[in-house]
Amino acid sequence: FAIPEDFGTEEEYRKRYTEKDLFDEFTQDENGNVVLDEDAAKAKIKRLGGYDKLYRIKLEADYLAKLAFDGAKRLYGDPLSDEVKERLVFELYIMKTMGFPGYFLIVQDFINAARTQLGVSVGPGRGSAAGSAVAYCLGITKIDPIQYDLLFERFLNPDRISLPDIDVDFDDDGRGEVLRWVTEKYGQEKVAHIITYGTMATKLAIKDVARVQKLPLSESDRLAKLVPDKIPDKKLNLPNAIAYVPELQVAEASPDPLVRDTLKYAKMLEGNVRGTGVHACGTIICRDDITDWVPVSTADDKETGEKMLVTQYEGSVIEDTGLIKMDFLGLKTLSIIKEAVENVRLHRGVKLDIDKISIKDPATYKLYCDGRTIGTFQFESAGMQKYLRELQPSTFEDLIAMNALYRPGPMDYIPDFIDRKWGRKPIEYDIPIMEKYLKDTYGITVYQEQVMLLSRLLADFTRGESDAL
């Protein structure tokens, strides 16, 4: 990511900061306390790439902090509250000392370009990234994690080395435009898609070998149909299927060499790569030419027909090379919303900003209270509609809780949740101070975040320990 020169350069940072300055900054905690012994501190510096790399990371981290605090002042007002400042300082410290500031600068760059330059609709944020206040202040997400008690540790845990993973939703039609923008900005040789390998499953291995062996199609189909969909307590593969199905044992000992050899070679080929594809959304953006890090091949872009670079390592291996995968997702729902907003503008003369519409709109709650939610993701099943009519949701938090509760296991608590909302059952807390985190869900523990926060409140767990629960 190209940082504006008027902010600073690596050369200036090398003159301004000594290696001792960097050692202290990257091995102490966010409050300047020594938390690592000397050997662990040296190992951390080495893991981050040594002092030469640290100068770049610090420059990126300082610029990221500037953008985050500028965004925070726009969103929360100036001066910032102590809660917001402490949250940002902690998150920025974790991002810096894990070596990820450049990643966040790139993500905010293409998301803001999509919104402001390309006119592409971007989702409000999904998954654990919505727990980052820095991501919110940068415009990566549109959900205030502090307001909704979303936790950063579910995204990046200081006690668990893990790569950041931000799934970014774009409208279906605009996803390709964003990818082209990224390729043009960062360079065609520095951007690549990720290969996928399709392997031979059990039935497919039988059919492929049978075709080459010129086994009659009817016999090929018969053998494939003998393979069960699952085997109790065992992995589904051909050796286990033969041991489980008597007819396959007979076929394996068949006097017909074509039948015997079909099963023999299918066992040898099962699980081997049959073909390649391109990951639907995974993309790599590299600071150097991608070929300096991984072998690449080319594939045809389905949208444009042009050739594009594809890594020859699949997603599960890419992380071991030090490269970070970014997911560019195309979401049809965003295209529908975008078209609806445009239709409102054309026919009603009203210009809507979908990110700023009220979440307290009475007419919308009336639809939910009536169970009229067909076509609404995760709220359209008959069972959900029934519970919505019983609940009569009146706050956004009610809808969030119903979405979390409507799944096997937690569903058992829905009647209790509804009764507590309407006063038919008392709202009780095992320990009075638990009300702080359970009030919005009427005393019922619904979210993982509540468990994490309660463990810190009641048992003095650290941020990292609460995530490991």
Segments and roles (model prediction):
Residues 1-469:
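Alpha-helical scaffold/interaction cores of sigma-54-like transcription cofactors
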